UniProtKB/Swiss-Prot annotation:
Domain of life: Bacteria
Family, per entry: Belongs to the class-III pyridoxal-phosphate-dependent aminotransferase family. HemL subfamily.
Metabolic or biological pathway, per its Swiss-Prot or TrEMBL entry: Porphyrin-containing compound metabolism; protoporphyrin-IX biosynthesis; 5-aminolevulinate from L-glutamyl-tRNA(Glu): step 2/2
Listed GO biological process terms: protoporphyrinogen IX biosynthetic process
Modified residues (N6-(pyridoxal phosphate)lysine): K275
Location of this chain's protein in the cell: Cytoplasm
Record EC number: 5.4.3.8
MF GO annotations: glutamate-1-semialdehyde 2,1-aminomutase activity; pyridoxal phosphate binding; transaminase activity
Subunit structure: Homodimer.
Primary gene name: hemL
Family annotation (Gene3D superfamilies): Aspartate Aminotransferase, domain 1, Type I PLP-dependent aspartate aminotransferase-like (Major domain)
InterPro entries: 4pyrrol_synth_GluAld_NH2Trfase (IPR004639), Aminotrans_3 (IPR005814), Aminotrans_3_PPA_site (IPR049704), PyrdxlP-dep_Trfase (IPR015424), PyrdxlP-dep_Trfase_major (IPR015421), PyrdxlP-dep_Trfase_small (IPR015422)
Protein name as catalogued: Glutamate-1-semialdehyde 2,1-aminomutase
PANTHER family documented for this protein: GLUTAMATE-1-SEMIALDEHYDE 2,1-AMINOMUTASE, GLUTAMATE-1-SEMIALDEHYDE 2,1-AMINOMUTASE 1, CHLOROPLASTIC-RELATED
Length: 452
């Protein structure tokens, strides 16, 4: 049984928060429900480290759920944000910075001809789906079980991330009407997608998929899966929406598409971006083919708007982050991710803990299962989440902050150095022993929570 360590300041803050905030947190996975104990309230971050309200410092392997690819408080980002704040926080008008950020995205991601800035990944996917329906004149959307595209009503069916962490098959408040035009299929099952297109192709507006699924744990697309979706969409006149909120500008300068689609010669019609492109501030985007984006207001009839879209502070952080993301940064992140994943897997193996490492570029996670492969949501759910909780708390006590859910991706930054890797290596064996002490049979989670 896991006995979480005391954290008096965080415990008091959590009690206060529970009185005024539902569940005590502003995004469900942060509540530690999946691992037990009290969430740590962080007060500062610097490089690869976080400091909590009790003054304890942790090596951060969450990186704000992806955005902090350069590490916390990166000097270039801090300087850019400070400079932007000093001249005003929001104008409600176009700004030079938003043009520069749009130009940078278009330059880095070849298929993106035009892009619209928004404030969150949820807004980006919601708007992309609306645009796809407006462009095609069709209503049906195909999504995949375990893939999370934000808390959009139509896309919460069999969603991953927080929905999975909390074990929710769906959520109250989402009506049947909202999901009536959503078809949910198993991830990586191209044959079934083809069968649905044969039956209902004339009604399908778009297929939306994570470029590499990372909200049920990390489950990469099988070879040919994304390209096959492109082929089927072409045959039946549907659009392909590639959700790169997590992978965009983190896997490479051109995201997952840059490592797969650019090489295999396929492109989606629309992309969604977030996380890294905001440098830790609320910023996201959707973009793609010029003829599709031309249907968006004010150029076209499909309406989308936002008071703080293109906010100059978030734009400044995003520009500074993307400009600092050189090939050297991506190489460092790839190396550190491989180092950490290898260390953890070795420790678990030495203690006889059944597990399956899984990665997509520098995103990685571990399924606590004896399965040889995990290719979809059902496989991701069939794992011993209690063992993960034991591993999590042992690492937390050793000053290593992991995702508080077995269904979330792990992240490193360019700031993670040899010392941080050595400390992780020193902590992993005890954590593996803690996981090994949790007995079988496997504790099957009913489902993953939503992006944090």
């Amino acid at each position: 049984m896991v006995v979480p360590s005391a954290a008096p300041a965080s415990e008091e803050l959590f009690r206060r928060a529970e009185r005024v905030v539902p569940g005590g947190v502003n995004s469900p996975v942060r509540a530690f429900r999946a691992v037990g104990g009290t969430p740590r309230f962080m007060v500062a971050g610097n490089g690869p480290y976080l400091t909590d309200a009790d003054g304890r410092t942790y090596i951060d392997l969450v990186c704000s759920w992806g955005p902090m690819i350069l590490g916390h408080a990166h000097p270039a980002v801090v300087e850019a944000v400070s400079r932007a704040v000093s001249v005003g926080t929001s104008f409600g008008t176009p700004t030079p910075g938003e043009v520069e950020l749009a130009e940078l995205i278009v330059d880095r991601v070849g298929p993106v001809e035009k892009v619209r800035l928004v404030n969150s990944g949820t807004e980006a996917t919601m708007s992309a789906v609306r645009l796809a329906r407006g462009f095609t004149g069709r209503s049906t959307i195909i999504k995949f079980a375990g893939c999370y595209h934000g808390h959009v009503d139509a896309l919460l069916a069999s969603a991953g991330s927080g929905v999975a962490t909390l074990g929710l098959p769906d959520t109250p408040g989402v009506t049947g009407a909202a999901t009536a035009d959503t078809i949910v299929l198993p991830y990586n099952d191209l044959a079934l997608v083809e069968a649905v297109f044969v039956e209902r192709g004339e009604t399908i507006a778009a297929v939306i998929t994570e470029a590499a699924a990372a909200n049920m744990g990390v489950v990469p697309p099988l070879p040919g899966f994304n390209a096959g979706l492109r082929r089927l969409c072409d045959i039946h006149g549907a659009l392909l929406i590639l959700d790169e909120v997590m992978t965009g500008f983190r896997i490479s300068r051109a995201g997952w598409w840059g490592n797969e689609g650019a090489i295999e010669d396929w492109s989606p019609d629309l992309f969604t971006f977030g996380k890294v492109m905001g440098g830790g501030l609320p910023a996201a985007a959707f973009g793609g083919r010029a003829d599709v984006m031309a249907r968006l207001a004010p150029a076209g009839p499909v309406y989308q708007a936002g008071t703080l879209s293109g906010n100059p502070i978030a734009v400044a952080a995003g520009l500074a982050t993307l400009r600092a993301c050189t090939d050297e940064v991506y190489a460092t992140v790839d190396t550190r991710a491989a180092d950490v994943a290898g260390i953890v897997s070795t420790a678990l193996t030495e203690e006889g803990v059944a597990h399956l490492p899984s990665s997509a570029g520098s995103l990685f996670s571990f399924f606590f299962t004896d399965a040889a492969t995990v290719v979809d949501y059902a496989g991701a759910q069939a794992q011993n989440t209690a063992r993960y909780a034991a591993f999590f708390h042992s690492m937390l006590d050793a000053g290593i902050y992991l995702p508080p859910s077995a269904f979330e991706a792990w992240f490193v930054s360019a700031a993670h150095d040899d010392e941080t890797v050595e400390r992780i290596a020193a902590a992993a064996p005890a954590a593996a022993r803690a996981a090994a002490a949790v007995p079988e049979p496997v504790t099957v989670s009913a489902s993953p929570e939503g992006r944090a």
